[in-house]
Amino acid sequence: MKTLTIIPSRLSATRLPGKPLLKINNLSIISHVFKRAQEANIGDVIVAAEDQEIVDDVIKNGGSAILTGKNHKTGTDRIYEAFKKLELKDVDLIMNLQGDEPAINIEDITNLNTKMVSNQSKMGTLAAKIKDLKDLDNENIVKVVTKEDLNKDHFSKANNFLRRSLEVENIYHHIGIYCYSTETLKKFVELNQSKNEIENRLEQLRALDLSLIHI
């Protein structure tokens, strides 16, 4: 199976505007993410950006980028526009990496890709154990509740995503990396945003409505 990694990015981020172009060791954050994705060696990588400045920066630093529209409600919608523009016919999976995570673990990328292929899943994401119970009440740390206890060799159905929780059983820190089959990506963006998704600012809740997502 062939995987394409698409990294959505924009300058007008809510928490820290302009973050993709902030420099770490003389290289922009978005270019760091691009290079980490390349190092995972799972397939081609491209940045999907709504700002020409981001496109120019990525290309200047040896990467690939495509300009998208500015009116997307989520990063996944931006990814789908980029995928359609590329007109690639031989791609099976789309890997979605967050454009503001320069220290993303390369092993996480390869592990998710491997699990998607071996389990023939429609959509997958990652989670890690919560080490500090204070994180359960931290709205900046997204949590996921799974149907079954997780281990590194097993995918489980996601039951819920949330920002605050008092639950302890089968609850994990959600890692914001996704992989979809191309058919699932299309189905996902064609769904209307749910009230739950909008109120919680978590687009992955849309996937729960179709029972698509596994951890």
List the model feature ranges, each with a label.
Residues I46, Q52-N111:
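Short phosphate-binding loop-to-helix
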Residues D57, A82, K187-F188, A207:
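Residues that scaffold the ATP/ADP-binding catalytic core of kinase and kinase-like folds
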Residues V189-L210:
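A C-terminal functional module that forms or caps the active site or interfaces directly
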Residues N41, N61-G62, L210:
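Short, structured coil segments at secondary-structure junctions
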Residues I213-I215:
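Conserved small/polar residues in nucleotide/adenosyl-binding loops
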Residues N105-S194:
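Conserved core of the sugar-phosphate nucleotidyltransferase
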Residues K2-A49:
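N-terminal glycine-rich phosphate-binding loop and ensuing alpha1 helix
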Residues T14, P102, Y178, N200:
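Residues that recognize and position ribonucleotide moieties
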